[in-house]
Amino acid sequence: MLIIPAIDLKDGHCVRLKQGLMEDATVFSEDPGAMARHWVDQGGKRLHLVDLNGAFAGKPVNEGAIKAIVKAVGNDIPIQLGGGIRDLDTIERYLDDGISYVIVGTAAVKSPGFLHEACYAFPGQIMVGLDAKDGKVAVDGWSKLTGHDVIDLAKKFEDYGVEAVVYTDIGRDGMLTGVNIEATVALAQALTIPVIASGGVTNLDDVRRLAEVESEGIIGAITGRAIYEGTLNFTEAQALADELSQI
């Protein structure tokens, strides 16, 4: 199971939000490229980037910072990116820039046809980001709750050729309250496509609990605030996940 460091970008800086609230941002670094390189040097096998401004604006905003990260990382590890991706031109531009996987969130919920087109145009490189609160999907940078049940919606996307589902529990994101194992496992069990867990991964116990259910289809866990504030040592977390994967 991959432990995936998150780099959330706001106004060109690396930040973390609590429950997706832009006004509750903590700046962790003003040099996104250096931060990305740090996680590679610590043994990271993949990076998770989010253009937070883009998620709210509905178009790319932090492209400069994203290019700096790609340049710093080079071809060392894959990078997945979400936030503000609403058209095929944006996807193509990011992939040309060196991003490995593009995460379609709001646009997948509002325009399933667009998601289908994206999967057809860029096979193996499109993920779906489903962000949920109490089992209901949120859109537009988490600012609006829909009536869609997260499992029902994810199952509709299975035949599209989606590479993975990035599932975020909004209520736990950035709160250091522990991962929602039950909801994550329920989603993974309902799908044939892999799930990457996000939101609330706080300590080694969370990593252990997720790694123990990896066989249900959970291929990774994204962590942000915990590795920046020190409640989780990234290198230890990946080592534990690797160890449990071999049992």
From Swiss-Prot:
GO BP of this protein: L-histidine biosynthetic process; L-tryptophan biosynthetic process
EC number: 5.3.1.16
GO CC, alphabetical: cytoplasm
NCBIfam families, alphabetized: 1-(5-phosphoribosyl)-5-[(5-phosphoribosylamino)methylideneamino]imidazole-4-carboxamide isomerase, PRK13585.1
A GO term, aspect molecular function: 1-(5-phosphoribosyl)-5-[(5-phosphoribosylamino)methylideneamino]imidazole-4-carboxamide isomerase activity
Catalytic machinery residues: 8 (proton acceptor), 131 (proton donor)
Pfam families the UniProt entry points to: His_biosynth
Subcellular localization: Cytoplasm
Lineage summary: Bacteria, Pseudomonadati, Pseudomonadota, Betaproteobacteria, Nitrosomonadales
InterPro entries hit by this protein: Aldolase_TIM, His_biosynth, HisA_bact_arch, Isoase_HisA-like, Isoase_HisA-like_bact, RibuloseP-bd_barrel
Domain of life: Bacteria
Keywords: Amino-acid biosynthesis, Cytoplasm, Histidine biosynthesis, Isomerase
Catalytic activity: 1-(5-phospho-beta-D-ribosyl)-5-[(5-phospho-beta-D-ribosylamino)methylideneamino]imidazole-4-carboxamide = 5-[(5-phospho-1-deoxy-D-ribulos-1-ylimino)methylamino]-1-(5-phospho-beta-D-ribosyl)imidazole-4-carboxamide
Protein name: 1-(5-phosphoribosyl)-5-[(5-phosphoribosylamino)methylideneamino] imidazole-4-carboxamide isomerase
SUPFAM superfamilies xref list: Ribulose-phoshate binding barrel
Pathway listed: Amino-acid biosynthesis; L-histidine biosynthesis; L-histidine from 5-phospho-alpha-D-ribose 1-diphosphate: step 4/9
Family statement: Belongs to the HisA/HisF family.
Main location: cytoplasm
Name of the top EC class for this enzyme: isomerase
HAMAP family xref list: HisA
